Amino acid sequence: MTDGDTSPAHTRPDAFGRVRHLHFVGIGGAGMGGIAEVLHNLGFTVTGSDLRENAITRRLAGLGVQVVFGHEADHVQGADAVVVSSAVQADNPEVQAAREYRIPVVRRAEMLAELMRFRYGIAVAGTHGKTTTTSLVASVLAEGGLDPTYVIGGRLNSSASHARLGSGRYLVAEADESDASFLHLKPMMAVVTNIDADHLETYGGDFDQLRHTFDEFLHHLPFYGLAVLCHDDPVLRDLGPEIARQVRSYGFAEDADLRAVDIEQSGRRTRFTVVDGEATFPVEVNLPGRHNVQNALAAIAVARELHVDVAAIQRALQRFQGIGRRFQDHGTLRFGDARVTLVDDYGHHPREIAATLRAVRDGWPGRRVLVVFQPHRYSRTRDLFEDFARVLSEADALLVTEVYAAGEPPVAGATGRGLCAAIRARGQVNPVFVETLEELQQVLPGVARDGDLVLTLGAGSIGGAAAELARRHGVEDGG
């Protein structure tokens, strides 16, 4: 494929005309903080505000970005543009002040699209796996000497960051379908991992509308662009022939362009053989589960298209250090005489939970799996209630907390307690309802048994609770 001049030198402060000072409202969000860091490193004046301090705001402050807490109208003074995420409401005082002062208000995805306009953009979309896949793509391209810029929705453990400004011509970015904002992006290459029923509130509850939006996203590719699609996903398999662009498929299916065979998992490491036409080569990825084999295949497909050599691909996948809250190993915990392994994962959709549970069963056969699940959003709990009840029934022991609302009003019946009742009625496992995460700290030690693998799951505050459990009860190896 060919493209125009995408030299990083073109993304200078003068590339945005008169705009030199960018103010981020909600700068502590994963997607926002990453873009802010890249723009700061490009030489723009970046400021931001958020409700409270977190790891992202601390990192940005350490880089020299001015971050304030609370939202006040005078925070936007001096800004040439104000960047907001979809979580920021129109009545936010900083947004209102920006409009009053005629300061442009730009959505996060629009700003990402502007960064992508000056580089060879590689956008990774999909309902599940996009953060891991984006991270793998960035890691493989970096190992191949391409030094990409990346903006990721999770924190790469290798760099302790969501973003990095590289000297190369490639920008690897996670593309968010949850609010349809990925339609702002116009990449040269697009990866789609899967299309599943989630965030349907954005699409009027209509899955066909969600599917159509992914179709539209793929047609934002230039006529010489490339769509990299998972051939194992039935929706993408059907959608592929409709895409009037070059398509490269990957997966386990025999008719995929790039596929994995001879898959073996041991603990968190997975080995397989890549078949790419007449070429075959072995790979070991430092991630567990067949779903992560698919994510690795997507990264390999991108790397092969950009002529990264096989040895670099193999090194990057073998050395991959993972992402925060994606099967994050917190090590051994001790509750009295019981010693358990604690793993924390962002999985919050039935399909993600099923994939993670399968990875645990395959990598740690014979271990009792104690799941601690925090449902995320009342709307998702309502829409996928029976699917949640079915997949969570596969745990050997189960604790369920109240729903993490994420700003949503309660929905009758779509509660943690209601989910426990539905799971109990299935008769496979007897769940324990835990009202709060503070209560979890007291209840879990009494439920855990020696040798358990404790798996905390959810997209809300459960990750912080897992870290607190590790802080209170963690032991050194051999301790």
Swiss-Prot record:
Q: What class of enzyme is it?
A: ligase
Pathway note: Cell wall biogenesis; peptidoglycan biosynthesis
**Compartment(s) of residence:** Cytoplasm
* Catalytic reaction equation(s): UDP-N-acetyl-alpha-D-muramate + L-alanine + ATP = UDP-N-acetyl-alpha-D-muramoyl-L-alanine + ADP + phosphate + H(+)
Q: Cellular component terms, GO, for this chain's entry? A: cytoplasm
User: Is Ligase included in the keywords of this UniProt record?
Assistant: yes
Cited Pfam families: Mur_ligase, Mur_ligase_C, Mur_ligase_M
Gene3D superfamilies registered for this protein in UniProt: Mur ligase, C-terminal domain (3.90.190.20), Mur-like, catalytic domain (3.40.1190.10), NAD(P)-binding Rossmann-like Domain (3.40.50.720)
Which UniProt keywords are present, listed alphabetically?
Answer: ATP-binding, Cell cycle, Cell division, Cell shape, Cell wall biogenesis/degradation, Cytoplasm, Ligase, Nucleotide-binding, Peptidoglycan synthesis
MF terms in GO? ATP binding; UDP-N-acetylmuramate-L-alanine ligase activity
* Record-annotated membrane-spanning stretches: none
Q: Which PANTHER family match?
A: UDP-N-ACETYLMURAMATE--L-ALANINE LIGASE, UDP-N-ACETYLMURAMATE--L-ALANINE LIGASE-RELATED
What is its biological role? Cell wall formation.
Query: Which family, according to the similarity comment?
Result: Belongs to the MurCDEF family.
Q: Which HAMAP family match?
A: MurC
> What name does UniProt use for this protein?
UDP-N-acetylmuramate--L-alanine ligase
State the organism named in the record: Alkalilimnicola ehrlichii (strain ATCC BAA-1101 / DSM 17681 / MLHE-1)
